[in-house]
Amino acid sequence: MIKKILTYCAEQLNSYLSRYYHRPQGLAEVGHIGQRTGEIPNKVIVSLVNVERETAGGISNNVQTYGGSFTSSSAPFLLNLKVMFATVFEEKQYAESLSVFSKALAFIQSQQKFMVDNVKYTLTLETVSTFDFHNIWTTMGGQYYPSVVCKLTGVVIDSNEIKSSGSTAQNTEVQT
């Protein structure tokens, strides 16, 4: 599911950027930002940088009753994804990367809510301190590119596996 959501974001961003820049190979893709070897892609790279569990929706077991029986399963994971949009361009194209980065920010601002497979997701800009950005980029290989981190909410991971089942009490009287 995570791959599908990030791919959708990259495809929509690519479609948006194609209004302003005409590149047959596109300008956005899902990828790993750090430790690049070889050719620089000259694109906006959409990359997952962190996953957080959302606890506001509750984390208790899911119990369902059916007549005189019940099933119990683990609560689904409600997740927030931290997604980085980075303009990974060659050094000589830095000015162009800033132009593309500005358009990418306009895309994020205009597409804060979207749907994939009838599930609604929200994409919001995160405020990341210079210190935290330094840590992120150091972890990913040290080469900095103009970038922003967004919080993507609405991701649910649910295995739908039943942990236990049983039957409910049929007699409510207590014998002594």
Locate each region found by the language model.
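Small/polar-rich, solvent-exposed N-terminal microdomains that initiate assembly or binding
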Residues: 1-63
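Oligomerization/assembly interface segments of phage tail-like spikes and tubes
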Residues: 73-90, 102, 145-154
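Long protein-protein interaction modules used by eukaryotic assembly/scaffold proteins
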Residues: 1, 80-81, 85, 90-93, ...
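Acidic-leaning, charged glycine-interspersed low-complexity segments
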Residues: 99, 106-160
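A broadly used, surface-exposed interaction patch
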Residues: 55-85
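"Short basic amphipathic alpha-helical interaction patches in structured regions
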Residues: 60-65, 95-103, 119-120
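Short, cationic low-complexity segments
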Residues: 69-76, 165-176
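Short conserved micro-motifs at the rims of enzyme active sites and ligand-binding pockets
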Residues: 57-59, 160-163
